[in-house]
Amino acid sequence: MLQQLDLIQHEIEQYHPTTLQELEEFRIKFLSKKGTITQLFTEFGQLSPADKQALGSKLNALKQIAQEKYKIYASQLQSTPKQNTDVNEDYTLPPPADKLGSRHPISILKDRILEIFEKIGFSIVEGPEIEDDWHNFGALNFSPNHPARDMLDTFFISQCPDILLRTHTSSVQIRVAESQAPPIRAISIGRVYRNETISARSHCMFHQVDAFYVNKNVSFVELKQVLLYFLRSLFGEDIKMRIRPSYFPFTEPSVEIDINCRICNGNGCNICKHSGWLEIMGAGMIDPNVLKNCHIDPTTYTGYAFGMGLERIAMLMYQINDLRLFTENDVRFLKQFKAYA
């Protein structure tokens, strides 16, 4: 073993790394957990007491020589300015392109929905997120004691009890109908707020789509065809739609719209609770009282309206199982949508 130590010491002394990569190779070869010196210490433990006494100091000195050499060259190489050693580098080439971010999935879906409805004549409208009680509740036929008016469901402004954060974009429908004469065909997409616990399935802030059409002789058949056109444009021609009766204060009759589950293709899974269907939006014919509140004669004009949560649509389209991902700004999540932009 003494001869082996002499050979390794000679090899260490002759080693003169010129780059950090060569220095790392030196460390791995001699000082790493599987390096030569570590293996020598393992073999040293199996020697007789007499051999240990003769070789112990020599082995420790060898390790110290290697460590000192590594330390000296590490200091020298790390302080030396990095030089360009690539003689084949072409300085006439353009620089690498900047790494661009991706659009948010909600923005992608919002633009897609607006594009679909613009093709059939819907105008894009907007309204305030801080709303008054009349436009958010009263004009939409909510009774004074309706549960939605409770502080447990709605964010009210403490200094002004009549002012609140809108709970739906239907308030935009009222503002547009007050300021325009029929025929009116409009769609609005924006943030809404509800006093709900933040979880994988609910949030205190989300986006809602609201669209309506008012004209003479508007029928439920038109509503059905518009919704079928929208769902086929968004999800594909193979989409199936189911209409169920429901209740909303601002429409009569009111319906819920279901589509066949995109996860299990209608066969039944945990997402659709093994029914094969997923609720996707609410719709109906505008209640005559709502038209009156907007100074529109319900004996002359009729209309339909429908609304849906944008995040819910996005979760179905992109198979996302946690609503909170939309607001956490996790780059790992967002960069997956470059292909959809």
Curated annotation (Swiss-Prot):
According to its UniProt record, the EC number is 6.1.1.20
Per the record, the domain of life is Bacteria
Gene (UniProt): pheS
User: Which residues participate in Mg(2+) binding?
Assistant: E252
> What is the protein's name according to its record?
Phenylalanine--tRNA ligase alpha subunit
Co-factor note (free text)? Binds 2 magnesium ions per tetramer.
GO terms, molecular function: ATP binding; magnesium ion binding; phenylalanine-tRNA ligase activity; tRNA binding
Q: Which UniProt keywords apply?
A: Aminoacyl-tRNA synthetase, ATP-binding, Cytoplasm, Ligase, Magnesium, Metal-binding, Nucleotide-binding, Protein biosynthesis
InterPro entries per UniProt:
aa-tRNA-synth_II, aa-tRNA-synth_II/BPL/LPL, Phe-tRNA-synth_IIc_asu, Phe-tRNA_ligase_II_N, Phe_tRNA_ligase_alpha1_bac, Phenylalanyl-tRNA_Synthase, tRNA-bd_arm
